[in-house]
Amino acid sequence: MTAIFLMSVLFGLACGQAMSFCIPTEYMMHVERKECAYCLTINTTICAGYCMTRDFNGKLFLPKFALSQDVCTYRDFMYKTVEIPGCPHHVTPYFSYPVAVSCKCGKCDTDYSDCIQEAVKMNYCTKPQKPHVVGLSI
């Protein structure tokens, strides 16, 4: 029985390493415009996780396309639009953001993803907050 248990654990670990863990994950972002009176807190989903990848030793001898690595990216997504409260009439109060429906491990597509790692940007409010809850008016 101990051998069966040990084999089950080893099999589980092997499968866990072979599978990628790239899934839609809850994310909270804060949106504000300098002309508007309020900051909006939005709950959305983004793609996050780990993808199996390899780093080749002979990089000098490979073509450039063979050097790209898989990233956790959108398989399917949709855009939602919200209205930032407290904006003057001359300012467009609408803000659109992506919502991850499903994710995949694949090449980064610059048509809809930022494929470089930037410095951490501000993700907090400097103005009074107005939380945005889908389907409810607060």
UniProtKB/Swiss-Prot annotation:
InterPro entries recorded: Cystine-knot_cytokine, Glyco_hormone_CN, Gonadotropin_bsu, Gonadotropin_bsu_CS
PROSITE patterns: GLYCO_HORMONE_BETA_1, GLYCO_HORMONE_BETA_2
Positions of the propeptide segment: 133-138
Major localization listed first in the record, in broad terms: secreted
Glycosylation sites: N43
Tagged with keyword Glycoprotein: yes
Cited Pfam families: Cys_knot
Functional description taken from the UniProt entry: Indispensable for the control of thyroid structure and metabolism.
Official protein name in the record: Thyrotropin subunit beta
Source organism of this protein record: Lama glama (Llama)
Gene that encodes it: TSHB
